[in-house]
Amino acid sequence: MESPAFFFTLFLWFFLLSITIYSIYIGFGPPSKRLRDPFEEHED
């Protein structure tokens, strides 16, 4: 368990997981109220 590859893999896993959780929070959480919708702005 002292292998550098193990710690690097663990770091990458936590990094990707945190980016995924942050993206979901931005997309669906309270900050999503400030996001603009280009389809609603477009008039036909």
From Swiss-Prot:
Highest taxon listed in the record's lineage: Eukaryota
Residue ranges of the TM segments: 6-26
GO cellular component terms attached to this protein's record: chloroplast thylakoid membrane
Major subcellular site: plastid
Signal peptide range in chain numbering: none
Membrane topology (UniProt): Single-pass membrane protein
Location relative to the cell: Plastid, Chloroplast thylakoid membrane
Example GO biological process: photosynthesis
Pfam families registered for this protein in UniProt: PsbN
Keyword annotations of the record: Chloroplast, Membrane, Plastid, Thylakoid, Transmembrane, Transmembrane helix
PANTHER family tied to this protein: PROTEIN PSBN
Similarity remark: Belongs to the PsbN family.
Function description: May play a role in photosystem I and II biogenesis.
Protein name, as recorded: Protein PsbN
Organism: Oedogonium cardiacum
